[in-house]
Amino acid sequence: MSGRNCLTIVLAAGEGTRMRSSLPKVLHPVGGQTLLSHVLAAAPGGPGTSLTVVIGPGHQAVADEAKRVRPDVMTFVQDERLGTAHAVLAAKEAIIRGADDLLIAFGDTPLISADTFARMRAPLRAGASLAVLGFHARDPAGYGRLIVTDGRLTAIREDADASPEERRMTLCNAGVMAFDGRTALRIIEKIGNANSKGEYYLTDAVGLVAELGLTAAVIETGEDEVRGINTKAQLAEAEQVMQARLRKAALDAGVTMVAPETVFLSADTSFGRDVTIEPYVIIGQGVTIADGAVVHAFSHLVQASIGRNASVGPYARLRPGTSVGDGARIGNFVETKAAVLEAGAKVNHLTYIGDAHVGAKANIGAGTITCNYDGFNKHRTEIGEGAFVGSNSSLVAPLRIGAGAYIGSGSVVTKNVPDDALAVGRGQQTLREGWAKRFREMKLLARKQKTG
């Protein structure tokens, strides 16, 4: 922003006890990504920016997640939970390095946008020492009110301390703040703990700014964007908002969804042009769907790629490592895992393909299973281009079926099959004419003798 550099501190030290979970609060998912990852993705990045996350003791998993999302991140530990200002000062080492702008955000607000972070910095460029993010609450009870006088923020009044007139105000504190880096540390270090809990509250910075004769401003945003997550119910509400956003973005990008309210997407889902998603499809992390592909109803996809004009489902499950080539088909009640299907390959019914490579235009018959696990290790199956595997076949890995080869239906194949060969691995059929009639007569006679 106009050459100003920026340090963002994300506070993520809370235990999240109301989540009633052993998982740290900020690692719970919304839209297929952790709460923390959404905030870090929205935070300013690129040249002239730096990022810090404050974590709680023993929360190495939070530090690891931060590093996964933003490899440039620094992490600091808040050893004691003594309030938000105390948490910010846990990252004092990063603050004293100097930055024009200091953004302070929270790891449990996954709906906040990069645009809002950018707008928070604008008053600093205009000379303000502090900007506070606010929103008009549908029900403001319990929120701190932002008291604005002559266009300037003069106080944050907690609900319990507010006058009747102030309680009627709907402009509330969202918690996110932006400080002018030149005065930030001086202000934050002056915050005291003379309150019932003996904690250091960042909200007290507004009063200190006024005492110093400096300016504090308010930036407004929508209530949904600043939803904090403290309970599983709030997590579910945030998921609803996130899914509505993701569906709208997909529709705006040209994806056809007949019943979008039944489709669940991940924040990193990538769509090509003219993609169709039928009802009741769940798309997890790491899925890319190329131009013209169709995902039919009741399918579940995670960490998979679907090629141009390919077809998946209905009732298909694509597990991590699946790659479906251009024009390939995955049909009903098919499960794939760590499987590559080349262009035009067909796996149309009732099949498991795992740890396998299926060549272009190969056809896999109904009921085929790649037997990839021997109880200790996984093994691969290679099926060549144009091969035909008959229905109800078991392919015992490690195994290679050559290009153009045929596998007879009902076979158990344990040895490699050369190109263009026929393999039949089933028992010899036995035929006894009249046996069924004699068997029924024998059973009926035995029943009559037993009943007398």
Swiss-Prot record:
NCBIfam families: glmU, PRK14353.1. It comes from the Bacteria. One of its GO terms (cellular component) is membrane. The active site is at 349 (proton acceptor). One of its GO terms (molecular function) is magnesium ion binding. This is Bifunctional protein GlmU. It comes from Nitrobacter winogradskyi (strain ATCC 25391 / DSM 10237 / CIP 104748 / NCIMB 11846 / Nb-255). Mg(2+) binds at residues 108, 230. The gene is glmU. It catalyses: alpha-D-glucosamine 1-phosphate + acetyl-CoA = N-acetyl-alpha-D-glucosamine 1-phosphate + CoA + H(+); N-acetyl-alpha-D-glucosamine 1-phosphate + UTP + H(+) = UDP-N-acetyl-alpha-D-glucosamine + diphosphate. Keywords: Acyltransferase, Cell shape, Cell wall biogenesis/degradation, Cytoplasm, Magnesium, Metal-binding, Multifunctional enzyme, Nucleotidyltransferase, Peptidoglycan synthesis, Repeat, Transferase. Pathway: Nucleotide-sugar biosynthesis; UDP-N-acetyl-alpha-D-glucosamine biosynthesis; N-acetyl-alpha-D-glucosamine 1-phosphate from alpha-D-glucosamine 6-phosphate (route II): step 2/2; Nucleotide-sugar biosynthesis; UDP-N-acetyl-alpha-D-glucosamine biosynthesis; UDP-N-acetyl-alpha-D-glucosamine from N-acetyl-alpha-D-glucosamine 1-phosphate: step 1/1; Bacterial outer membrane biogenesis; LPS lipid A biosynthesis. HAMAP family: GlmU. GO terms for biological process: cell morphogenesis; cell wall organization; lipid A biosynthetic process; peptidoglycan biosynthetic process; regulation of cell shape; UDP-N-acetylglucosamine biosynthetic process. UDP-N-acetyl-alpha-D-glucosamine binds at residues 11-14, 25, 78, 83-84, 144, 158, 173, 230, 319, 337, 352, 363. SUPFAM superfamilies: Nucleotide-diphospho-sugar transferases, Trimeric LpxA-like enzymes.
